[in-house]
Amino acid sequence: MALGGGTFLVQNKVLPGAYMNFVSVAHASATLSDRGTATLPLDMNWGPEGEIFTVELADFLKNSQTIFGYAYTAPELKPMREIFAHAKTVHFFRLNMDGKKAANKFATAKYPGKRGNDLRIVVEANENSTDEAALFDVSTYLGTVKVDEQEAVAAITDLTPNAYVDWAKSGNLELTATLPLTGGENGGVEDAA
């Protein structure tokens, strides 16, 4: 509050004294945001090929296994954890191209790469299964973690794709203790030049 009781805007003050009005020129902030946007091309074992995909910090914390094929704490995700320490949004690009998808007689991995070799399919009899109408419980495992389960399925065509595998279009379900997906390979890193 200025001397004389008020802020000086116009010459209308009745009290004697010196009135001063300081106005600063607007200037750009020198502080940088610690939560911006970044881009990171990487050689990855899982994920879409040939496209840029965007991941938010909240998605990375919650769904890193679905997006990158590994749990948040896995050593394979250290570069991702480091960039998300100061970024809110990251655009990723998978450098390795022309990889092969792991597969078995029931399913094919969603993405090419050697991480698909850690997927396993387990087919068990459903508790409501009868001799006339066989029903199955089909589970998808990534390593030792169950990532999907579909219960009371009569045929392979009744299975819905999940975040890890696309199911075969034909064939018969049969009891299987565990059937790994095999043949997944990372492609080579392409030179952009």
Regions found by a protein language model. Give the residues of each.
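Surface-exposed assembly/interface segments
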Residues: 1-193
